[in-house]
A protein has these predicted regions:
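A structural signal for small-residue-enriched, beta-sheet-centric alpha/beta enzyme cores
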Residues: 1-90, 94, 100-408
Length: 408
């Protein structure tokens, strides 16, 4: 059984965190811009990265440091992507070296991430100068997780953190995470930053398998704006301090751990979709009756990624034709004459399309349903028994404003 707990990225035994303003963000000294997460013990570690061909320097460094499947710490900055910029990998390595010196481990045991403006040289010297102070703030507390969560935010309006507890092999295991993501988010992994910590004892091979499986059903099922970033990374550290027998293969223990990890990541993914830049609505699209799960996911992704559908939800307009249109260009084969569509929220549910044809419906009720903060598009395909749920958000005037002056 999975239970929700407090503590965020510090919920698991042996993990400490900190966040501090060191000067990467020059426009606001009150905004933290560097985060540090450290384990008291060596960790099995894994990560999944952006599929964008243009990858930021920290991704190359982190991939190299993960070659042995082990790590001790994560250092991350916001305000500068360290992508397509001079001395990118050198500066990423300098961040790792500074963190390693401050906490007492090898530079290759530190994973590094960046997020922010692309194409500008990272002021790595201010990170180096602030690292000792940042390390001095490390502690295992909810406040420390909160500080780290805020330190990786860019256009986010709220922090994203969560933690769960479960039982693995008779031992209490905790998993916590922090994430950032508000724009440049599209389901294709990776599409954000997410740092996960756990005290579960699990091999590097199995923690990677669990992360890949989990990303597929969580972060790969969200979309804000259709853009896949150059930097985005989801990583996990597992230090084994829970004391369970090390998971080295599939079985009951692995299934229990995987269930908890998926629950955590789905919650974080929903937080990111809900906090899309300028968004007013969280959109859930559930496609049922598909021929298989992959088909259902492709169609649901297409619907939540549709700019016209997003605009309709922003306007509280039950324009179901845009849903069918997005389904039709998804690349999946299906019979439109079998499709049913309904809109739902806390205010109720209203069918708007049956067997590919529009229904007469109460426009006022539909508007009330779509006025809620969280709305659902329910699609039935009539092609099989498979289903999938994806998450997105509406598009508003504020999205244009935020991104029109992002660099200023």
């Amino acid at each position: 059984m999975v239970s929700w707990i407090d503590g965020g990225v510090c919920a698991a035994q042996g993990f400490r965190a900190a966040g501090l303003h060191v000067g990467v963000k020059t426009h606001n000294v009150n905004k933290k811009d560097v985060a540090l997460i450290v384990s008291d013990a060596d960790c099995a570690a894994a990560a999944v990265f952006t599929t964008n061909v243009v990858k930021a320097a920290p991704i190359h460094v982190t991939k190299a440091h993960l070659a042995n499947g082990r790590a001790r710490a994560v250092v991350a900055n916001s305000g500068n992507a360290n992508a397509c910029a001079p001395l990118g990998e050198e500066n990423a390595k300098r961040m790792c070296a500074a963190a390693a010196k401050a906490i007492g481990c090898g530079a290759e045991d530190v994973l590094v991430c960046s997020t922010g403006v692309i194409g500008q040289t990272l002021r790595v010297n201010v990170i180096e100068e602030g690292m000792e102070e940042l390390a001095s703030l490390l502690e295992r507390s909810g406040a420390a997780s909160d500080a780290a969560a805020h330190a990786i935010m860019t256009t986010d309006t709220v922090k994203k953190e969560a933690a769960v507890e479960t039982t693995v092999g008779g031992k209490t295991v905790r998993i916590g995470g922090i994430a950032k993501g508000s724009g440049m988010i599209h389901p294709n992994m990776g599409t954000m930053l997410c740092f996960i910590t756990t005290d579960c004892a699990i091999s590097p091979e199995m923690i990677r398998e669990a992360l890949v499986d989990t990303a597929h059903v969580s972060f790969n099922r969200i979309s804000v704006d259709g853009d896949t970033s150059t930097n985005d990374t989801c990583l996990v550290l597992a230090n084994g301090l829970a004391g369970n027998e090390t998971i080295t293969g599939e079985g009951e223990d692995y299934a229990a751990f995987l269930e908890a990890l998926k629950a955590l990541c789905v919650r974080l993914a929903r937080m990111m979709a809900k906090d899309g830049e300028g968004a007013r609505h969280l959109i859930t699209c559930t496609v049922a009756g598909a021929k298989d799960e992959e088909s259902a996911q492709t169609i649901a992704k297409s619907v939540i990624s549709s700019t016209l559908t997003k605009a309709a939800i922003f306007g509280c307009d039950a324009n179901w034709g845009r849903v069918l249109c997005a389904m039709g260009y998804s690349g999946e084969e299906f019979d439109p004459d079998k499709v049913d569509v309904a809109f739902a929220s806390a205010a109720g549910e209203i069918p708007v399309c049956r067997q590919g044809r529009g229904l007469d419906f109460d426009e006022d009720l539909a508007k009330r349903i779509l006025t809620e903060d969280e709305v659902e598009i329910r699609v039935r395909m009539g092609e099989g028994d498979a289903a999938c749920t994806c998450w997105g958000c509406d598009i508003t005037y504020d999205y244009i404003k935020i991104n029109g002056d992002y660099r200023t």
